[in-house]
Amino acid sequence: MPLKKLLQSPRPASNVGEEVFFYAGTALGTVVFVALVLGTQMGLAQSRAAALPLQAAAILGAPLPRESASIEAVLTPPLYPQRDFGVVEPNVLAGTALIFNLADERILFEKDIHTPKKIASLTKILTGLAVLENLNLNSKVTLTPEAVATFGQAGNFDAGETFLVRDLLTAMLVQSSNDAAQALADAAPQNILDFINKLILDLGLEKTSIATVTGLDDADNHATAFDLMRLILYSSDQRELWRLMGLPQATIYEVKNQTPHELFSTNKLLGKFGVIAGKTGFTTEAKETYVAIFQIAPDQRLGLVILDSPDRFTDTQTLINWANRAYQW
């Protein structure tokens, strides 16, 4: 197998197998060359730090900067952010955690990101994408008794009430209303779950499975943090989706009687620590889950995924504080 094809493998270098040892000598020579070149530009200490990730990949079989990194990306690492290896990796409570750069998809921190975990209401990001593709935001939806009977009281809806699609979408993404999610799914002209699972297939989210639009524990909705990273990257240009996930509160009105429904975000970190937008999730089996986009520098935004956590907001603060100290922006 050519070296370029090896480095472009969709699996981490540690999973490539015996072939990585065949090319270790070549890769190690490349490490030395890159270190020397970088040394002339940024000093010996910095060049050694810059060469470490590639050296680890070549010798130890550690993951490359991106799971599908090209040889050009590996041999020409971005100047910023620069890792300060004097700052040790954070100790997070979550079973799974991930921070990545939205601009170049570079993974900055990872913990068990390829093991499928239950995602709870993070499912509603996929449901939101399906709603935006299949329903007119200005169309009307009347809540059925079945929709209102869905577990949870978020939104404080009654059967027979009518709302615009955009308002139910707001309730689903701001206050994580299960009633709103089910009502939107029922109103769609095509099966929402079929659309979601086709989208999963199209995006290549190989370890993601969705069986309900809400994410409740009665169905096995699971994904890996790596798949959720790819979902965030794909959905980041859906401004309405992320605008709603960035609202700390909202008021929607029932169409017939103009009855107001006050909504308050479940995302308690909005506007703090640079957090711009995000979605929370919780079930007994999934524990606390969270995805977010946050501002780390004036022109730098990072994505974050937390799964299987007893305290997602503490984990998030730990990771954001670490990212500020561990990288030069």
For each feature predicted by the language model, list its residue ranges:
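Domain-terminus/edge residues, biased toward the C-terminal soluble/receptor-binding domains
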Residues: F22-T26, G39, L205-E206, D220-W329
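Active-site-adjacent loops and short helices of periplasmic peptidoglycan-processing enzymes
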Residues: L7, E18, A45-F226, L233-R239
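A subset of signal/propeptide-processing and intrinsically disordered low-complexity segments
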Residues: A13-S14, L36, T96
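Core hydrophobic alpha-helical transmembrane segments of single-pass membrane proteins
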Residues: T26-L36
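N-terminal Lys/Arg-rich, disordered targeting/topogenic segments
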Residues: M1-A27
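Hydrophobic single-pass membrane-insertion segments
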Residues: L36-L52, Y327
